[in-house]
Amino acid sequence: MSSDTGSEYLDEEIRGDELGPSIDDNALAAAASAARLPFDRPTDHELAFFPELWEHKTAVEVFLLLRNSTLATWQYNPLKECTALDVRNNVFPPFNSDLDLIQNIVHYLSRHGLINFGRYVRSTKISRFLVRDRRSVIVIGAGAAGISAATQLESFGFDVIVLEARNCIGGRIHSFKSKSGEIMETGGDTLRKIEDSPMATLLHQVNFEEHGVFDFTSVFVEGRPLNEEKIHLFLDHYKSAHGALNYQAHQCEHRDDQGSFISRQQAYENLLSMCERGTLIKYYNFCKSLETVARAREHHFNQMKQLRMTALMAENQLKKMEEEGNLEQDPVLRRSLKRDIATSLEKFEEVADAFETADNHWQRLNEHPQAKQYMHPGSEFATFNFMLGFEEYLVGAQLEKVQFSCDSMQNKENGVAARLTEGIAELLTQLSEKRKLDIRLKHRVLDIDYSGFEHVLLKVQRENGDIEEMKAAFVVSTLPIGVLKKTIIADERAPTFTPSLPDKKVEAIRNIGCGSVNKCILEFDRVFWTANGGRNQFVTVSPNIKTRGSMNIWSSVPGSKVLCTYIVGEEAMLELPDDVIIQNAMINLQKAFGNNCPRAPISAHITRWHDDELAFGSGAFMSLRTETTSFDDVMEPLKTSDGMSRVYFAGEHTCSSYTSTIQGAWMSGARAAADISNDHIGIGFVDISGTRGQRGDEEEELLIEVDIDGKIPEKDENEAVADIPNAPNAPNAQKPEEIPKIAEEIELVAEAEKAEKAEVQLEPLVPTVE
């Protein structure tokens, strides 16, 4: 595990410095893909921050080389900060000559959570550009989004407090240990598409062991295992249908006559109807072809029979004339009979070839008959419907409620999924401890008042019931979509906003769907599901289409005696007693494993996230009312009376491409931190246009050297103000006309100091003084 000082990583860091990443096209392409960026072109977001790329193609090529090299450098050793000098050392001349551009790229990627995030050792200094009162941030929620936002904001020089209403870190990522010491994950337990997820970097930083899931899965239909050939057959059918839907979803919006979005269930039914219709047409054409070939075969056979009889009759008559000695008496008849025999035999050969062709065709048609139905309505249809049930498990709702245009499933299905031996909650807990975040548990936010000037006021209920008011310059809300839905209907169990949320945001919250995935977690005295070549993940197909997404997927971590299954959508909201749910689960297991399955588990736990007052559901999805702008409207920050954006929103429900995923939650927190920094301390790029901004006074005092695992040292408010050149309240603020001269002197001194140093050190930027 990681230490507070990061000394454990020294050997690996030295090796990374000596060897460096393998910078070739394949490595650069892999690095860009792992960061979810295109390898061969800049994104629109990058073009907005680097407008000089519009000028000529060469600038784009250089930018892509440096950007991808930066990503590769960070991914090679994410235990240590990736600096501009590290990147320059890994790029060949002359592309490493523009250190300012490299610095800007490193700054951009760091700011937006693509490099230098999580738990790593810093080698540069952190700059604080705001006075203490103006750099305070309160993050509501200590889930993946909250931890991500807090760690990023602290790296950017903000003072962060995280408020968590629960008694532990993780939010909807929750786990506990049973009496026998087994980890039971009651919340999010799977990391999806991990190969291009920031979670892979976090796993590497804390040295956690992960296990792939759903790579090869056993399938049981009515208690009998399905052979792998049939499994792949159904998978191919599903992938074809899924691919067709995804293709159509990206062509245009799909709405019905009333203007409502078409559901994925309706789209699948339409597709299956088309397949059934196509199958019937093929069956009709097959029958028609079979009948035509059979008639042709019969016709050729009759022709052969007739020609044979003709030749036989002529031959018999010719023999008779020969026996009677009349061959010379009637030469015309003799020649006529011989001609009939020759003609019949010649024609017979032609007809025989045609008959053989028709007969072979007829046999092939009978050997490979055309199916009358695309899918058997019994077990085959139920098995295929399990694939749709797997989609419901990923979304958390029945496909009847999910928009056809929803394309977030591809970011959950494709790629490698993994579970952790220690549990995902432990990953976030260790990361928070190593970063020494100020997380205050059992602090429930009751009201978010953004009506003030230059601050946001929170009303917080502490563990003992006392109400406390907390003030911050900025707030990052990671309240789940289920809680926000309760807020807009004035449910007393949900926090309130003062003033009320804007109508556009309220409508967006109302339109985004909130799924529900509950778990039935069973602990046994032994692992029976891996016996006889079994696997840690398996499927039991339900014959009932209504329950196709519930209690069908079973998952466990290798070596663990805990087995869990999932209950999805409306089935998850049924208020069945725990013992009934456990009994239903055991019935499914006993059908699949027979006598190998124990009669009952030694312990069990049922989750009910839809009733959890701090969640009210499992995650967001695109409902039939969700518009393309809904997610942007939800994450639109709220402005205080001074016109400044101060309340920002994060959470998986603000990440449209990765809803209902831990990865989406983490990415949304990094995005919110970047938005706050960009809005209030500026982009912070080096001016490479030729007219550089002047650097401020007392630059060295502004730079604070810290380890990322350590707490940023506190500074006196007056001292912090004095550190900022020409600040309004600074005691020795310089006049504007004196600034260029002072800046010039500082630059000369800085250049002299650099010349004396054996190793070049990059200086973090100070905002330009206007």
From Swiss-Prot:
GO terms for cellular component: chromatin; cytoplasm; nucleus. It catalyses: N(6),N(6)-dimethyl-L-lysyl(4)-[histone H3] + 2 A + 2 H2O = L-lysyl(4)-[histone H3] + 2 formaldehyde + 2 AH2. The keyword Repeat does not apply. Its EC number is 1.14.99.66. Pfam families: Amino_oxidase (PF01593), SWIRM (PF04433). Its cofactor is FAD. The keyword Iron does not apply. FAD binds at residues 137-165. GO terms for molecular function: chromatin binding; FAD-dependent H3K4me/H3K4me3 demethylase activity; flavin adenine dinucleotide binding. Probably part of a large repressor complex. Interacts with CoREST protein spr-1. Interacts with chromobox protein homolog hpl-1. This is Lysine-specific histone demethylase 1.
